[in-house]
C-alpha cells in the first residue's frame, strides 16, 4: 500500500493554476468585457493583461466570429459549450489561427464566462494546404482536358 499525499487545494491560489496552463484562458463578464487573461492568452493576443482588460471580446476578435455567439449562448443557457475549428482573427495579430474554443459559465458569479482557446496543430494546417493543392490540381487537369477536347 502506498501512502498518497493529498494536496489541500484551498491553499493553491486559483490565479496561479490559471497562469500555469499552456492554453490561452480569458474570463469575461456578462457584457463580454475581459476581466482576466493568463500568460498564454497575453502571448496569443500579443498584448499585456493591463491592455486586454481595457477591452471587450468584441474589440479583440474579428466581427462576426463564432466565438462571440458562443459566449452569448453560454451566458443565456448557463451551460458549457464548445466550437471546433474556429478561425480566430484579429487586427492585433496578422494571421488567422484555427482553434477549438471552450466556454463555460463560472458558477457563483453573475454572468461571468471562462474561455479556453486551444490552437489547432500544425498537422491540421498542413492537411488544409494539401486539400487546397489537390483542388488546384483537379482544376488544372479539368482545364487541360477541356483544351484538348476543344482542339479536337
Predicted regions and their residues:
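Sensory modules in modular signal-transduction proteins
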Residues: 2-50, 140
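Terminal output helix/cap of sensory domains in signal transduction proteins
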Residues: 9-15, 44, 49-100
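A generic fold-level signal
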Residues: 20, 29, 52, 96-98, ...
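Short, charged amphipathic alpha-helical "coupling" segments at sensory-output junctions
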Residues: 1-14, 123, 127-135
Amino acid at each position: 500500500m502506498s501512502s498518497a499525499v493529498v494536496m489541500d487545494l484551498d491553499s493553491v491560489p486559483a490565479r496561479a493554476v490559471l497562469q500555469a496552463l499552456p492554453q490561452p484562458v480569458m474570463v469575461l463578464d456578462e457584457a463580454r468585457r475581459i476581466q482576466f487573461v493568463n500568460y498564454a492568452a497575453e502571448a496569443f493576443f500579443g498584448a499585456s493583461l493591463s491592455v486586454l482588460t481595457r477591452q471587450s471580446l468584441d474589440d479583440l476578435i474579428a466581427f462576426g466570429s463564432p466565438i462571440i455567439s458562443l459566449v452569448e449562448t453560454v451566458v443565456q443557457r448557463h451551460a458549457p459549450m464548445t466550437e471546433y475549428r474556429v478561425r480566430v482573427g484579429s487586427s492585433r495579430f496578422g494571421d488567422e489561427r484555427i482553434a477549438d474554443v471552450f466556454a463555460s459559465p463560472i458558477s457563483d458569479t453573475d454572468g461571468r464566462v471562462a474561455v479556453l482557446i486551444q490552437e489547432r496543430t500544425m498537422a491540421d494546417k498542413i492537411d488544409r494546404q494539401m486539400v487546397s493543392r489537390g483542388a488546384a490540381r483537379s482544376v488544372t487537369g479539368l482545364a487541360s482536358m477541356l483544351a484538348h477536347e476543344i482542339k479536337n
